[in-house]
């Protein structure tokens, strides 16, 4: 009897072990899967002094142009970062956005609105060719700023490591990439800042850091760095970046400028208000109409309004009181 019981327990334990191993195997298969790729891309490598450009395009002139622009951006960024690449930086270029979304160089899904990605550990820049050369050049310059940022943190030898990037607010990281790839003056960013001034909603640095969902880091970050560069010069940018990586932006402000982040917020806000207030002097017309749909009587996101033919109603898309977007009707 004891032998039968022992055999039963032995078989039971064997089945448990097989089940556990099978689950682990299935889990490994699930998490080890690559993204769906619809065709094989035969990449080639174009070497430049500082980059390995991976491409599969048959357009030789485009490849040479990308290689040239990469080196141009390197020279520009190197002057500000005061850093050089100890090894060539990989740049992986896709012919279009759908094929870029299938890349396995970056883990995770890539959204339609993502223009490019820079991977942290190897600083691999992954991007598609955009619709026009100006957009492609901008995305390339933006992503190469991130490559420099990662290299400074990992290889700069200034008591920083990659995990120090967690101390740097998103608006500071992305704003710097926009500032170095676009410059001090940008009509698109100015449009955002004029809107913030008109609505009396110029944020403090604390709000930018804690409410990035309300204040787009790219635009507000670029505006802040433009203020810093115009007021103190671009030479203070890297000291502020490094100190922020080591201690956080609030302590970094004190070490670099001698006053706290709230004072810096006030100076930035005053400069913004003075700049856009002067533009209103030539404005004689007043906004026509009243606000029918806003965050107080609808959702936080209200888009695509359409007025009925008789002008009595307006329909719009909103996430009001819902987990997803739906169609709503309001009196006009």
Write out the residue ranges for each language-model feature:
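Short coil/turn segments that connect the beta-strands within blades of beta-propeller domains
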Residues: 310-312
